[in-house]
């Protein structure tokens, strides 16, 4: 299994913010599918391009083909509460986000987390984040 390391403000390796479509294809291969400006790779890695054709947003969903790490822990296999506790040492999330609970946006870090359901301990749902993303400066403004 591949391991993609998140470098805040820079990359979800090997894809870097600011890369061109050709550069992305050279490091990760041809996309599985393309929807508008969003290119999908490896059953879970999504790359969005801006109007100049440069990467502005990289999102990694949970996948059987790769794991995504940040600050030494696996984002999709670590309890969301623990992820938030650790990331809040680096910055704070937007408490006014209308989807708070489902999503956590750390604007100063250009980092976001998302899950499709709120935590339900009895059902065991919503305990982990389904996706993590980084973006170019100003994307979350």
What are these regions (language model features)?
Residues 1-141:
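Short helix/turn-capping signatures at newly exposed starts of structured segments
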